[in-house]
């Protein structure tokens, strides 16, 4: 973000785009997502599916962006079932250590959680691995991670960064590029849940219908 804030004014005839940050400049488009909305749905589904009524969250870095994932998840869970307990969040402190992700997830599973949502980059693959070993559920993030461990990833909270970037390039090619913040929310299809093709039977039609509402 700071690099773009410094560079963009020096090249006023060049168009720039940045993901997950806001840069105010006449030649920069900021691509932002309502992660809290998609995470709300993930938490809602987790609460409906949980048998222990305890849920967990593993984040990467403890920064405002990841706090949006956490807050949405917790709000969704409590909306679905006020009796659900969302255990104190764990943070890996990095985006890469799958071992750390696994340790954090195992600690949450040991505390009674049976669904753990991760927003931890590659470290989150450790969360998914732990879910399989423990016979519990993980929730994937950003892309469709349902296939990573089929049947153990309850769903994935998908951010359509690909669509946002494609739209930006398309706008540029058609001379429709506009600077400023472009927000991709639930209504616009910028965030949402995966198809859950490997877990639909475990979730049940009634719960799936509630999430769609």
Regions found by a protein language model. Give the residues of each.
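A residue-level marker of the well-folded mature domains of exported/periplasmic proteins
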Residues: 1-213
């Amino acid at each position: 973000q700071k690099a773009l804030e410094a560079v963009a004014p020096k090249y006023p005839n060049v168009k720039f785009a940045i993901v997950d940050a806001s840069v105010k400049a006449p030649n920069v488009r900021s691509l932002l997502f309502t992660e809290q909305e998609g995470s709300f749905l993930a938490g809602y589904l987790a609460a409906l599916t949980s048998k222990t009524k305890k849920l967990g969250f593993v984040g990467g870095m403890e920064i405002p962006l990841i706090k949006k994932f956490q807050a949405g998840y917790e709000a969704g869970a409590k909306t679905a079932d006020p009796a659900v307990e969302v255990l104190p969040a764990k943070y890996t402190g990095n985006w890469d250590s799958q071992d750390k992700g696994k340790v954090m997830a195992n600690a949450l599973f040991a505390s009674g959680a049976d669904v753990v949502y991760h927003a931890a980059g590659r470290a989150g693959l450790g969360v998914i691995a732990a879910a399989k070993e423990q016979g519990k559920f993980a929730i994937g993030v950003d892309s469709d991670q349902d296939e990573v461990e089929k049947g153990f990833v309850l769903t994935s909270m998908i951010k359509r960064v690909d669509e946002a970037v494609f739209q930006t390039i398309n706008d540029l090619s058609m001379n429709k590029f506009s600077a400023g913040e472009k927000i991709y929310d639930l209504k616009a299809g910028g965030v949402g849940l995966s198809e859950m093709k490997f877990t639909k039977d475990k979730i049940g039609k009634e719960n799936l219908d509630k999430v769609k509402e």
